[in-house]
C-alpha cells in the first residue's frame, strides 16, 4: 500500500465496502456523538466521513485531533445505514472505521476556520492565505483559473498561434503606468524595469518574421489598487499578428473568448454578436468606455429642451461653450422616493445634485412631476418624454455642464439605476468593442498634449492626420468591454518610423528621446517592418467574471492587499545594508 493513501477522499463508494484503505488529508470537521468520534477528512478532491469508536487502538490519539490537523488513517470501509446516506457527497454512501492513525502535521489555533462560510477580514485572509486557499470556494476558483488558461492555450494553438516567452527584465518605457525599477549591480546608477507588457518584444517578433505570437504573459505595473485590478502584477493573454487590419484581430480573439465563456460560464448566456461602438458614442450613451450592455439604459443629449427655458441653472450653463444637458432614462423609476435617492447619490459623488422628472397617472391622462417639470413647462416636458420614449411610472434624471465634469458620475448613476430597478440582466455576458479612441489628450490644467492610450498605435489617416488638430486624431485602438469591465485592449501598430517620430513629436517627445527610449524598436523598423497588430486580454478579469466575484483577489493565488503589501511574505521589506552598498544605492529619509 502507498505510504500515504490508496484512494483520494472523493473516491470511495459502496463498491469499496469491506476493503481496507488508507487516506490522508485534513481534519475538516470533528464531532463527538455518544463516545464515537466522527471526522470529515478532506483533501483536494473531496470529503470522506471517518469514525473512531472507543474500541479502536488509536482512540486516545484521535481524541486529541483538532481542525486542520493533517493526518493519515488506515481503516475499513463500511456502508452507512440507508437513513444516514448523504446524497450531497460522492462518498455519502460509506464511512471509514479507523484502525490506525498518524499525525503528519499538527495544527495550532486557527486564525480563520476552513470549515463553513464565515467571513473574515481580507487582511486576515491574505496573511494566512495558505489557510484561506484550503476553503472550497477558493480551491474552486483556482482550479477554474487553471482550466481557463489551459483552454485559452489550446484555442490559440488551434488557430496556428505559437507561444513564445519574452524577457522579464527590460528597459523602462512610458506605457501608461509607473514602472517597477530593478537596479543593476554590474552597471551602477542604471536600472532595468519589469515589463508593463511585452509590447515592444512582441512587435519585434513580427519584424523578425514570425507571423503569429501569443503568450500567457506576466505584466508588472505600479498602480493604484482597485477591486478589479492588482496593484503590482497581473497576467494577460498577449497576442500579435502580421499583415492584419483591425477586423482581423477581432475575428481572431472573438471565437477564443466566446468559447471560453461558453465553456466555463455555468450556463450563462454569451452574446453572439459583439457590437462596435465608437469611444465618443460610448461616453455619450454610457458615460464610460467599458459599458455594461446588460443594462439597456442609453443616455441622450436633451440640451434643446432646456435652452432658454424657465430652469435658469441649466439655461445659463448652456450659454457657455462646450456644455450640454444629458438625460438618463429610468424606466420604472417613477417615484419621488427613488428620485430623491438618486439625487442624493449624485451629491455623494461630488456633484450639486441631479435634476429629475417622473411621470405618474393622473385620471385619464399622465402628469409630469418634479421641480424640473414645473420650471420648464408641459410642452418641453412632453418633448423630453417623447424623445426618451418614457411613460407612466418612468423617470428621467438630468446632468448639465461640460461632459468631462459630469460624465463619469452619469455613468455610475446609470449603473445604479439599472441595478436598483432590476433592469440589468443577470446570467449574461454582454460584449462590445470600443473603437476610434482619441490618439491624444490634453491636460486640463496645463494644456499639454500626450498620448491618451497606446503610444505605439497607428493614427487613422496616417502621417497627414498628425499635421492637424491633435485632439481630433483617432487611433486604430480598441478595447473589448464585458459586463462593465475592460477585458481586452489592443491596436494596429505604427510600424513606419516617419509616422512614429511625428506622433511622438506631437506628444512632446523629441527624436533623440524616442531613439533613446525605444532604440531597439525604432532601429528594427528600418529593416522592413510588416504591418501588424494585436491585443491583450486580462486573465485575472476573465476568471473574475467567470467565478462571479467582484474582487480580483478572489482569483489570484497570493495577491497583494490594497496597499501593495504581501502580508504573508512581509513584502516590501527593507534591504540589508550590504545589498544597498553592492548596488550603489542609499535610502533617503522620508519627510
UniProtKB/Swiss-Prot annotation:
Residue positions binding ATP: 221-223, 486, 538-541
A biological process from GO: aspartyl-tRNA aminoacylation
Stretches for region Aspartate: 199-202
An example Gene Ontology CC term for this record: cytoplasm
HAMAP family per the UniProt record, alphabetical: Asp_tRNA_synth_type1
Keyword Zinc: no
Positions annotated to bind L-aspartate: 175, 221, 453, 493
Family: Belongs to the class-II aminoacyl-tRNA synthetase family. Type 1 subfamily.
Keywords: Aminoacyl-tRNA synthetase, ATP-binding, Cytoplasm, Ligase, Nucleotide-binding, Protein biosynthesis
Localization annotation: Cytoplasm
Name of the protein described by the UniProt record: Aspartate--tRNA(Asp/Asn) ligase
One Pfam family it belongs to: GAD
Enzyme type, top EC level: ligase
Catalytic activity: tRNA(Asx) + L-aspartate + ATP = L-aspartyl-tRNA(Asx) + AMP + diphosphate
Assigned EC number: 6.1.1.23
SUPFAM superfamilies registered for this protein in UniProt: Class II aaRS and biotin synthetases, GAD domain-like, Nucleic acid-binding proteins
Species lineage: Bacteria, Pseudomonadati, Pseudomonadota, Alphaproteobacteria, Rhodobacterales
Encoding gene (name): aspS
Gene Ontology MF term list: aspartate-tRNA ligase activity; aspartate-tRNA(Asn) ligase activity; ATP binding; nucleic acid binding
Role noted for this protein: Aspartyl-tRNA synthetase with relaxed tRNA specificity since it is able to aspartylate not only its cognate tRNA(Asp) but also tRNA(Asn). Reaction proceeds in two steps: L-aspartate is first activated by ATP to form Asp-AMP and then transferred to the acceptor end of tRNA(Asp/Asn).
